[in-house]
């Protein structure tokens, strides 16, 4: 009898020491913050063993897979999260990001549209959807999204730069030059912006002196694509 009581006590102790679903999830998040993504996935899998309906664990696992550039596996995990609960914008946004990395721009836009419908306050959705629309050459819609971002934060240099690319695609070199000036004012290390500014100044407006100055700046910043322009058009 005493032996049986002993084993019952041991089992009760082990059971009480078993981490809860929330504790496992929180540890997975901690490991994510420490960039230990594979270990984090193991903890999220343990959560899902306890509760296969935990949509947050599927979403978090997808993020960890995304960080490992395992985009197809991430998409699968985000999709499972959505199947369990489609009321949160997060898995739609995250799945859109994975599609964006795969250059599956149309699928990305569809997910960003859904995410935006669920929460229109998330500025990152507008920016990333703008990138996907840029990839689809839907320039006017991309400009709209980048403008939404810039309304909230005019100092977002990447939004300025990508807006400029959309404006060039939309045959608006005047607007593009303004956006590119804004870009290099905000980020003086953006060689690609100096390059695009210089090319646009020379090709659209015949501004050789200013264009060459910006092309040389791009080259000095390590943007090697500027070299052929400098060699061909900017030698005295």
Whereabouts are the PLM-identified features?
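Bacterial Sec-dependent N-terminal signal peptides
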Residues: 1-27
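Terminal, low-structured helical/coil segments at or just beyond the last alpha-helical repeat
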Residues: 17, 23, 195, 199-236
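Helix-start (N-cap) detector for alpha-helical repeat units in TPR-like alpha-solenoids
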Residues: 21-22, 55-56, 89-90, 123-124, ...
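Alpha-helical segment of the N-proximal tetratricopeptide repeat
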Residues: 22-56, 60-63, 67, 97
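Structural marker of alpha-solenoid helical repeat scaffolds
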Residues: 50, 84, 118, 152, ...
